[in-house]
Amino acid sequence: MTPAPGGAPAIRLRPAHPGDLPACVGVWHAGLTEYGVRVGRPAMPLTSGPLLRLLGHLLATDPDGFWVAVADAPGAAGAVTTHDPAGAEGPIIAFVSALRREHVWFLSMLFVQPGHQERGLGRRLLAQVLTGSDDATHATCTDSAQPISNALYSRFGMVPRLPVLELVGRPERPVTGLPDGIRAVPFDLLRAGPTDGAGPRRLAAALELLDRGALGYAHPQDHAYLGAQGRQGYLYEGGDGSVVGYGYASEVGRLGPIAVEDSILMGPVMGHLLGSVRPAGAFSAWVPGSASAAVAALLAAGLRLEDFPALVCWDRPFADFERYVPITLAVL
């Protein structure tokens, strides 16, 4: 526990528990709302369901990388009350989540409650979850309009390298579909039958091959999460049955992740995904600037660029972002 001067509550770091996640959502929302006011963005609605599920996934797969900061006195100014039935501790005022996928360590989220920022708390949390990761490549995604965060991550070697563009909207014009000889096979078709059958085994092997080639590591746990959240996946095959890519879309409009063997397929795969579902609202995707064929396909369809770009930061190269579109900024 770190003592605080002037009667301010002391701050204690501890591993997160499932009951902490609603308070983490509150910290996340408060931090983004305050940031939005500073940069002229509209207030964000508090929709906790999808974020709670994402935080639950991060905690389940990487509990050692998920920590919270707790103020020792309940009712600290502006803090969000955590799930603490016994009333034994104060509110959660910050949290961090980092995941490890093979040789890559990735900072998913780091949020500090307004009123407790710029006091070194983010650095403390980051140092905590970096412990034991000296052998890893370190990476994160950050907002280009966050100079303090970008400076912090750079001090730990995670230097901004690549813009990630947010594209949003409904298709207004047709775009190029899959070329002759390439077919899309729904994941659901491959998953039919026994879980240890030929279809599921072939799908798992194909995803691993594509992920290692484009992203630099396999992450079957994240594919399982996408399936549980209802994202619709497609495996793309050549005329000889060879696997050339995969992609996801969803009825809520999220596009990605996408991985392809050849970057020339990124545009056609994105075009196919745009036509594969009719979302309740708009489509949205976070697309690396180097995935130029995907960016061009979305712009040609009528989607628009939103806000400031995000930045992928790393200390060592690990992925070919010309051939990969991430899940979110929190989980590549």
Positions of PLM-derived features:
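Conserved beta-strand in the GNAT
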Residues: 66-68, 78-99, 106-111, 240-256
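Conserved acetyl-CoA-binding loop-helix of GNAT-fold acetyltransferases
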Residues: 109-112, 117-131, 150-155, 263-276
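Amide-forming acyltransferase catalytic core, primarily the GNAT-like/NAT-type
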Residues: 155-253
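Active-site rim helix/loop that mediates acceptor-substrate recognition in acyltransferases
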Residues: 2-4, 21, 26-88, 212-232
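Conserved active-site tyrosine of GNAT-family acetyltransferases
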Residues: 149-154, 158, 296-300
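Conserved catalytic-core motifs of GNAT/GCN5-like acyltransferases
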Residues: 139-142, 159-173, 305-316
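Conserved GNAT acetyl-CoA-binding A-motif
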Residues: 104-109, 132-146, 278-289, 308
